[in-house]
Amino acid sequence: MELAVIGKSEFVTGFRLAGIRKVYEIVDVPSSESAVKSVLEDKSIGILVMHNDDISNLPEILRRNLNESVQPTVVALGGTGEGSMSLRDKIKQAVGVDLWK
C-alpha cells in the first residue's frame, strides 16, 4: 500500500522531500475534486493525507465518501476552520471513547 498526498504547493512540498511519490498538487476546488476521485479509484493507495481546509472545500458527497472510506484511510491534517478537529476529537472518533476523561 502506498501513501498519497493531496494539497496546495506549500502543503505537499515536505511530503515530496520525504520521498512520497504519489503527490497531487492542487490549485483550486475542481483540481482537488479530480485528484480525490483519482486517489479513491487507485487501489494501490492505502493512506490519503489532505489538509483539513481542502477537505472542507470539497462537495458534500465527496466529503462523505472520504469520511466513510476504509481504503484509503484518510488523514486530515491542520486547519483552523469550522471543520478542523482537535487531536482529542480525532482519537474519540477513531476509537469511540474519550480517552482523556
UniProtKB/Swiss-Prot annotation:
Major localization class: membrane
Compartments where located: Cell membrane
Pfam families recorded: ATP-synt_F
Role played: Component of the A-type ATP synthase that produces ATP from ADP in the presence of a proton gradient across the membrane.
Superkingdom of the organism of origin: Archaea
HAMAP family found in the cross-reference section: ATP_synth_F_arch
Protein name, per record: A-type ATP synthase subunit F
A molecular function (GO) term: proton-transporting ATPase activity, rotational mechanism
Source species: Methanosarcina acetivorans (strain ATCC 35395 / DSM 2834 / JCM 12185 / C2A)
UniProt xrefs under InterPro entries: ATPase_V1-cplx_f_g_su (IPR008218), ATPase_V1-cplx_fsu_bac/arc (IPR022944), ATPase_V1_fsu_sf (IPR036906)
Entry keyword set: ATP synthesis, Cell membrane, Hydrogen ion transport, Ion transport, Membrane, Transport
Subunit structure and binding partners: Has multiple subunits with at least A(3), B(3), C, D, E, F, H, I and proteolipid K(x).
GO biological process terms held by the UniProt record: proton motive force-driven plasma membrane ATP synthesis
Top-level taxonomy: Archaea, Methanobacteriati, Methanobacteriota, Stenosarchaea group, Methanomicrobia
Sequence similarity: Belongs to the V-ATPase F subunit family.
GO cellular component: plasma membrane
SUPFAM superfamilies: AtpF-like
Gene name, Swiss-Prot/TrEMBL: atpF
Bilayer disposition of the protein: Peripheral membrane protein
